[in-house]
């Protein structure tokens, strides 16, 4: 199950990709630590749920945005009967160092090799941010529960 989660984490966690009003997308790295996970067994497939704490490195963020942010993320993933990842949804909630609140959501699909995320809503600088796309990959697998990822903007 931990290998499945490693794959799902890479596919699903693109909320660290941001679009600031009047700015282009910016790429970033993020570190995730699993805090809980659960597998619900079905006959023809399974549902994997996980929660993680993420630290987002926004070094290339536009002026006025913090250079780092943290979030709690929740993932619900559909697996085949052989426990291979198929698709899923995620959402992340965050209060940044400036006190601005944001809620992010998205979906991913293995067949399409995609993860699409958007800002559901927020306050302050997040009020006018919009949807974004990025390519995700794992840079370092530190342990079964900790990974460093990269989210590269698709412009």
Show where each model-derived region lies:
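Sec/Tat signal peptide C-region and signal peptidase I cleavage site
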Residues: 15-21
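Beta-strand-enriched cores of mature, soluble protein domains
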Residues: 21-155
């Amino acid at each position: 199950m931990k290998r499945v989660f490693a794959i799902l984490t890479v596919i699903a966690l693109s909320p660290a990709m941001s679009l600031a009003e009047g700015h282009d997308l910016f790429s970033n790295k993020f570190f995730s630590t699993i805090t809980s996970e659960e597998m619900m067994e079905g006959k023809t497939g399974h549902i994997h749920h996980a929660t993680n704490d993420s630290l987002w490195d926004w070094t290339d963020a536009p002026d006025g945005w913090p250079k780092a942010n943290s979030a709690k993320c929740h993932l619900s993933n559909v697996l085949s009967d052989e426990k291979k990842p198929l698709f899923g949804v995620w959402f992340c909630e965050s209060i940044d160092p400036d006190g601005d609140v944001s809620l992010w959501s998205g979906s991913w699909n293995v067949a399409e090799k995609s993860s699409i995320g958007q800002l559901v809503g927020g306050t302050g600088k997040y009020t006018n941010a919009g949807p974004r796309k990025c390519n995700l990959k794992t840079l370092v697998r530190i342990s079964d529960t900790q990974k460093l990822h990269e989210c590269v903007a698709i412009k």
